[in-house]
Amino acid sequence: MSAESHPTESQMTPKKLFYLTLGSIGVVYGDIGTSPLYAFREALKPVAHDGLTRFEVISLISLMIWALTIIVTIKYVLFLLRADNEGEGGTLSLLALLMKTANGHTAILMLLGLLGAALFLGDAMITPALSVLSAVEGLKLVTPRLSEYIVPISVVILALLFVVQSRGTGAVAKFFGPITAVWFLVMAAAGISHISDDFGILAAFNPYYAVSFLLHEGFYGVVVLGAVFLTVTGAEALYADLGHFGRRPIQWAWFLLVFPSLTLNYLGQGALVLGKPETMSDPFYLMYPQWALLPVVILATAATIIASQAVITGAFSMVRQGINLGFLPRREILFTSETNTGQIFVPSVNAVLFIGVIFLVLSFKTSDALATAYGISVTGAMVVTSIMAFEFVRARWNWSLPVAVIALAPLVILELIFLGANLLKIHDGGYIPILIATAFTVIMWTWRRGTAILMEKTRHTDIPLASFVSSIERKSEHSPAQVPGTAIFLTSDPESAPAALLHNLKHNHVLHDRNVILTIRTVNKPRVPSQDRYKVEQISERFSRVELLFGFMESQNVSQALATLRKAGLKFDIMSTSFYLGRRKLVPDANSGMPYWQDRFYILLANAASLPSDYFHLPANRVVELGSQIIV
């Protein structure tokens, strides 16, 4: 289900609401739905070093339930789902919205947004590795002889998952929701069946246990919080996938199925450990009888594959947003569905994620080891989102400063505590998500900054378009020869004569019957209605200026968009139209405004970018490229 296809809240029929709710269970809640596989197990380890007490077990479950309540229910389900950018959610969508109203702190907001996006991309590497490993590890309970095959089996599953990305998931995506719904029901049933082991576990609903535990445990309490946070990993997907399903389906799925199922399962795990402390080694799988283990492992593996698919798709979508907003160089984007433009495949991103995921599996080998590295990227992304949400309620909802502080400061403080708890795990692998996020942030910041410097340098040597057209339209003996047809010159600055136009005149001494100065601009909203797609200005008899507007969630298909210009009186015969593009050779300069290494890195990114003709879907046999050299 795509954002392009779901109706508005008021138009949603009960049937549509049901299918969107079911779909959201697989895509939105797949990640958080796999947390019971390892969250409670990891939380038990720091407190079980000197024996496990009844108070500690109840307190851990209490911490998990209240983490789900405060962070997921209150922050995401009830609050953030309303902070949308024309129906879209996610870090970059929120950043695009805030950039419209940023007053004096644009750079800080941008850096925060880029950091949040980078942390999400790091999460997209860790989630598949951790989820699949934790599911496949159930095989060692089926038969210990399979223990040595857990890593190879996980690698094969993940390799197949990334290989099939290029073929799209449309054919099987309709099963994601039902399979994940069954997964939640199975978890709920297991939890219910074991709560009777010790009804005392129901005391976990009392926040006294959570608070008292933290106050009495001291350092160990902080360490435990890092593991407790695994309970809410995947919550960012609620906001990121807002545009795919809408607010109501996501909320209904949470309150009717996901939240109750997770709560019941954690209560069941807690009751099991209270009754049988020896089960703390793997309380999730040990809730099931021996005959049910293999089916549950298979179902768990399917659920983790679906969760991994959702986060991979989210990474593709975020990269497309980043490219359209100018934070990333153009990359090849393929569409895997003829009817759903939301189903995309980005080969370069798929390759990077695949290499990263396999590296993590082979390096950490167990979900225990990998879980220590998981929380940092998620907590970091949540803190960034909360800070940006503070700016949102001030700028868009006009909340006063005291109201915004009272409402959001407790959330930010809580998440900072969780972040601090996770940072304690840096030496145990927590440095991995930090390195990944740093790398992606440097890439995006370098591209954004380098492009701004490049624009500034070219602006100094540009000729105003109005002056150029005025001079060229004066008939004289030096006037260039006129040739039939249409020439379209792509430029990022509609006020200046494109470099390709100047080079064409300089080297070929010709001018076409009709010349279109074309600018492609991405606006800070998800989509642009077809009637607002273009702006046309007739400069002279032979020159016109056209601006094509795209939302950051849209494919920038220029050939298709130009066809809509017929309504404005501009008709293009593709066989007599040539597209002129400027190709720049960039030379590093130590005094450009960026360090020399960053200049070199920017040039590397620029050289690796997809060709404009490919990215903008221009007919290859109608494209002419003219080069120039620029020092950056």
UniProtKB/Swiss-Prot annotation:
**A Pfam family assignment:** K_trans
Keyword Cell inner membrane recorded: yes
Show the InterPro entries listed in the entry. K+_transporter (IPR003855), K_trans_C (IPR053952), K_trans_N (IPR053951), Kup (IPR023051)
Report which reactions are catalysed by this protein: K(+)(in) + H(+)(in) = K(+)(out) + H(+)(out)
The protein's name is: Probable potassium transport system protein Kup
Membrane-related topology note = Multi-pass membrane protein
One GO CC annotation: plasma membrane
Record localization = Cell inner membrane
Q: Which family does it belong to?
A: Belongs to the HAK/KUP transporter (TC 2.A.72) family.
Membrane-crossing ranges are: 17-37, 60-80, 106-126, 146-166, 175-195, 210-230, 254-274, 292-312, 344-364, 370-390, 401-421, 426-446
Q: What is the lineage of its organism?
A: Bacteria, Pseudomonadati, Pseudomonadota, Alphaproteobacteria, Hyphomicrobiales
Summarizing the function annotation, the protein's role is:
Transport of potassium into the cell. Likely operates as a K(+):H(+) symporter.
What gene codes for this chain? Answer: kup
**UniProt keyword list:** Cell inner membrane, Cell membrane, Ion transport, Membrane, Plasmid, Potassium, Potassium transport, Symport, Transmembrane, Transmembrane helix, Transport
Citing just one GO molecular function, the answer is: potassium ion transmembrane transporter activity
